[in-house]
């Protein structure tokens, strides 16, 4: 972290979502409940897939890693946010703030890549079923998952590399509930446009690339489904994609609001609300989205419950 002539900032104070004690008490209970559901839902998905051998397929391997990423994503933000509801001020040392930003960006980026990998998996399964075992072999799955985490780490280090070159010598109050890059950038004493544009280009490139993979995959899927003569076949093919499409729409809808829309078109409070949705709410919703409409997941869950009850 760069130094200036004035006192160097050693910690950042997060202003959180609200200063009203009553509102904070209500929000604490709400988000504590959301976090518990997030952990239980995603851990259940991971355990269920690991224990059910018939779910050891590429689609569920990706879903298992998506659940892990959602746990990491939510855990990067929610515990600190919960503390902010119990205290008037929540302070994090500079190293803690850097670590939180690194974790959020890593897991958020990995989620983008995993959603793209899942779209490609659906494309191969529906458009080229005879080549599925070759195109989605265990080796290919390992590469796609590994690239997802590697992409997350590279993007995170882009943010951290720029952040560590900034000087913080004045105000230290971050108008957010976690150490996000944009609010931190506003507090920097040194104003270099390069440190603003590099993370934006990095994130923007990843969003565009993964959206293109998802869009192209679903265009081919739609064309293939429309060519099917059987109504039952169409319904079955489309039903395998609805959960993923729902998750993609929710995640990329909020990400687009934050990173694509002009910052002058929305306020800091709106930014906070949208950030809550994609860092806290979506990780809770994903297990529900992927399990409620999935017969294999529900079937595996029923079998596990029967084993527990009768054992």
Curated annotation (Swiss-Prot):
Summary of the function given for this chain in its UniProt record: Odorant receptor (Potential). May be involved in taste perception.
Record-given protein name: Olfactory receptor 5P3
Expression by tissue: Expressed in the tongue.
Naturally occurring in which organism (per UniProt): Homo sapiens (Human)
GO CC term (a single one): plasma membrane
Stretches of the chain found on the membrane's Cytoplasmic side: 47-54, 121-139, 218-237, 293-311
Glycosylated position list: 5
CDD domains tied to this protein: 7tmA_OR5P-like
A Pfam family the protein falls into: 7tm_4
GO molecular function: G protein-coupled receptor activity; odorant binding; olfactory receptor activity
UniProt record similarity statement: Belongs to the G-protein coupled receptor 1 family.
InterPro entries: GPCR_Rhodpsn, GPCR_Rhodpsn_7TM, Olfact_rcpt
